[in-house]
């Protein structure tokens, strides 16, 4: 079909074909019309049609600006092999080597990707239930907590060969790393071994040896955060809906703070400079605690089912990923926060990793129905 291109102003007659479209070009409205089948609209009808076009233009303009101003923009989708099923746990990144480590729990392996191309470059097998990964660049070693075996597995970062393992209790899960001492803190034990208490184990990652076990009442521990300027560790005690504070020099529990503004506290972000702890709960809130007093300051609404939360000090942003979306808040001051946006991911897409050095945010979305598991790569705006 041949089309004539016509741009018209105000009350002038406008040729309109039986099929027409409006396009945005240099802020003008363009009408595409069929020469052979055209009629003319003038006067009031033209004004009404013009108003419709203006309205459509504004809608599209606002939508476009909204995408550009969103805190995250999807730039890549990495599709995983169809046999990768079940939930994911935590990511790790090797910045120098350009690698992204992912932990599909039921796949009994850690997947290694080239984070620049999205290519799957290695599958590290022989892991019953991978939970968390630490990569030490100086030693080129990969440390993986295995919940089934109840140990910390240590792999060579070049050959991916298993070097050794450190025996823990079953359900070895979340970790916290002290870069100064090279000690890794691992929560393990609890309900999976039919105990009403859990262990926070201390492992020397250089020697590959366990140094101590710190007993904590409660059968389920989750994410933790370590202070750099003091020996404190803050740990989510999900069993008791509280935050436990451990002195890592004395290796003992020194305080417990109740979390009353939300339920099922699992994820955690930390703003050490402003003494704010962001305790993310699966009930759909973040409770903000003052680490100088242990008191709750405020609560922020987030998507339910959260599994990962992080605070970025440079941008003063909080990222919390729940069941199907990421909520991003900006910290205007230590007690006040503004929601920047809620970005959709996918069903049960609730584990993620912010990598400020790459300006990227990675989200794992499990396999669902006929759709394979995916890793979504967002650019941070």
Task: Outline where the language-model segments fall.
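Short, Lys/Arg-enriched N-terminal segments with co-localized hydrophobic residues
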Residues: 27-45
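Bacterial N-terminal signal peptides
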Residues: 51-61
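Predominantly soluble domains enriched in secretory-pathway, periplasmic, or organellar proteins
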Residues: 62-381
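N-terminal hydrophobic targeting signals that begin at the initiator methionine
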Residues: 2, 46-47
């Amino acid at each position: 079909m041949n089309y004539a291109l016509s741009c018209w102003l105000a009350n002038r007659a406008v040729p309109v074909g039986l099929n027409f479209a409006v396009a945005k070009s240099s802020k003008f409205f363009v009408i595409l019309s069929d020469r052979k089948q055209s009629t003319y609209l003038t006067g009031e009808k033209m004004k009404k049609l013009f108003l419709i076009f203006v309205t459509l233009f504004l809608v599209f303009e606002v939508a476009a600006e909204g995408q550009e101003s969103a805190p995250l923009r999807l730039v890549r989708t990495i599709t995983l092999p169809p046999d990768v099923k079940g939930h994911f746990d935590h990511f790790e990144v090797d910045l120098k080597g350009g690698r992204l480590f992912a932990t599909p729990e039921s796949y009994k392996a850690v997947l290694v990707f080239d984070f620049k191309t999205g290519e799957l470059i290695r599958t590290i097998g022989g892991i019953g239930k991978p939970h968390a990964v630490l990569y030490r660049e100086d030693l080129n070693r990969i440390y993986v907590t295995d919940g089934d075996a109840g140990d910390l597995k240590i792999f060579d970062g070049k050959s991916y060969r298993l070097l050794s393992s450190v025996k823990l209790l079953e359900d070895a899960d979340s970790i916290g790393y002290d870069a100064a001492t090279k000690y890794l803190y691992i929560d393990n034990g609890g309900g999976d071994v039919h105990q009403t208490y859990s262990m926070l184990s201390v492992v020397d990652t250089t020697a590959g040896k366990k140094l101590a076990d710190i007993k904590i009442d409660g059968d389920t521990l989750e994410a933790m955060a370590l202070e750099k300027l003091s020996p404190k560790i803050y740990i989510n005690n999900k069993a008791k809906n509280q935050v436990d504070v451990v002195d890592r020099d004395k290796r003992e529990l020194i305080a417990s703070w109740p979390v009353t503004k939300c339920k099922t506290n699992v994820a955690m972000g930390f703003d050490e400079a402003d003494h704010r702890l962001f305790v993310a709960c699966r009930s759909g809130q973040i409770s903000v605690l003052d680490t100088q007093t242990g008191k709750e300051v405020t609560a922020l609404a987030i998507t339910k089912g959260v599994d990962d939360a992080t605070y970025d000090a440079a941008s003063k942003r909080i990222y919390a990923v729940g069941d199907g979306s990421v909520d991003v808040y900006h910290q205007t001051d230590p007690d006040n926060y503004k929601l920047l946006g809620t970005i959709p991911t996918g069903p049960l897409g609730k584990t993620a990793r912010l990598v400020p050095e790459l300006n990227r945010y990675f989200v794992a979305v499990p396999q669902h129905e006929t759709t394979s598991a995916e890793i979504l790569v967002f650019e941070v705006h």
